Regions:
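Structural motif
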Residues: 70, 116-117, 147
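Hydrophobic pocket/interface hotspot
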Residues: 52, 64-65, 73-74, 89, ...
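Bacterial N-terminal signal peptides
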Residues: 5-13
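A short gly/proline-enriched turn/hairpin at secondary-structure junctions
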Residues: 73-84, 98-101
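Short beta-strand edge/turn micro-motifs at domain boundaries
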Residues: 18, 22-23, 137-160
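Surface-exposed, charged secondary-structure patches
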Residues: 90-133
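A mature extracytoplasmic/lumenal domain signature
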Residues: 69, 80, 112, 126-127, ...
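Short, low-complexity N-terminal intrinsically disordered segments enriched in polar/charged residues
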Residues: 17-67
Length: 160
């Protein structure tokens, strides 16, 4: 329970930093354009996550990691603490999920996608792993950023 409380506190802290007031003074036409763009952004983010589900479920961890920024600036926070960098995150996944039996089949349930600023969104949801070695599940909060036209995860906080 302590880990779960910690996870929810971390998620709440990140959520409280999000500025949701960025559309309050827009004209109706500007709001409609923003909403259309936001719908397109959200669809693109969900596509990245669907591609990740497929790659993970094929034990293609490199393919799964295509959804993350390939940079030392990537931050992943989970039960093992803070991991910095794309390569270290991949190495941790390979160590923890070396075979299809360990990686299993991944399913995401997205509960919310909210705009932080023009090129960033946070996504809150749940993950489910159906595995031969026993199922696993948990919650996550990830931050996507549009980098050169591609949506990439720049921060991931997952609790299982």
């Amino acid at each position: 329970f302590a880990l779960l409380r910690f996870c929810f506190k971390a998620v709440f802290s990140l959520w409280s930093c999000a500025d949701k007031s960025n559309q309050t003074n827009l004209a109706p036409q500007e709001k409609a354009q923003t909403q259309n763009t936001e719908a397109q952004d959200k669809a693109a983010i969900l596509k990245v996550m669907k591609d990740q589900e497929i790659a993970w479920s094929n034990n293609d961890l490199e393919g799964f990691m295509k959804g993350y920024i390939k940079s030392d600036s990537l931050k992943f926070y989970g039960k093992g603490g803070l991991t910095k960098g794309w390569q270290q995150t991949l190495d941790n996944y390979k160590k923890g999920y070396p075979t299809k039996q360990q990686s299993g089949t991944l399913t995401f349930t997205v509960n919310d996608i909210s705009k932080i600023e023009n090129d960033s969104y946070w996504v809150m949801g749940e993950y489910f792993l159906s595995r031969e070695v026993g199922d696993a599940n948990g919650v996550f909060m990830i931050i996507f950023k549009n980098i050169l036209g591609s949506w990439k995860i720049v921060a991931d906080m997952s609790c299982g």
